[in-house]
Design a protein with these regions (language model features):
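N-terminal leader/targeting and accessory segments in enzymes
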Residues: 1-96, 100
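Phosphate-binding loop of NTP-binding sites
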Residues: 31, 63-64, 75-190
């Protein structure tokens, strides 16, 4: 059964769109899951690309949509991006890094969102939990992407979630969630 599962994973492929922190984190997780991973970014690639990840020039990325089952978009990639439109038109699943991570994390998820104060509250809650003797992860939009927490031994995952990360339907089902406040921000995107 193990060899069969590995063969099935190897047959799956994902195109990660965005080669910054969350995109690279998603690519690393997908490689750990033995998937084939393509990576593209309109702004170029970092010096270090995770092992086994295949860089794809933006001009060639749409051609890869025939080879993948899903694309994972970084928070900086707007829903109106041409590659996103092309994927949706072909029936390719579009998800966020947060959704990918949510399928694989273990532990109680606490989500923090809102216009202001997310980082402060995320850090504070994780510190309080750690002081109470719990193994707490603080991340998401704050510093460490949630995909990097997959496989970690955490009791609680306190996740800062930006409005950009909430654009895509996802499987994150927090045990606790809070919206700190809502005001007009990022109107160019929303």
């Amino acid at each position: 059964p193990c060899a069969c599962a590995e063969a099935m994973a190897a047959a799956r492929a994902t195109l990660v769109v965005g080669a910054k922190s969350s995109g690279l984190s998603a690519a690393r997780l997908l490689r750990r899951l033995a998937e084939r991973v393509f990576l593209t970014d309109d702004n170029g690639f970092p010096e270090q690309i995770p092992d086994g990840v295949e860089p794809v020039l933006p001009s060639d990325a749409a051609e890869r949509l025939d080879d993948v089952q899903q694309i994972v978009v970084s928070p900086g990639i707007p829903a109106g991006h041409p590659l996103v439109h092309a994927a949706l038109a072909r029936g390719v699943r579009v998800r966020s890094e947060l959704a990918l991570a949510a399928d694989h994390v273990h532990g109680r998820v606490i989500a923090v969102t809102g216009t202001n104060g997310k980082s402060t509250v995320t850090t504070l809650v994780a510190d309080i939990l750690a002081a109470a003797g719990r193994r707490a992860f603080a991340g998401g939009n704050l510093g460490t992407p949630l995909c990097d927490a997959v496989g970690g031994d955490y009791d609680d995952l306190v996740v800062e979630v930006s409005s950009f990360q909430l654009e895509w339907p996802h499987t994150l089902r927090p045990a606790i969630a809070t919206v700190l406040n809502v005001s007009q921000d990022h109107l160019d995107r929303h």
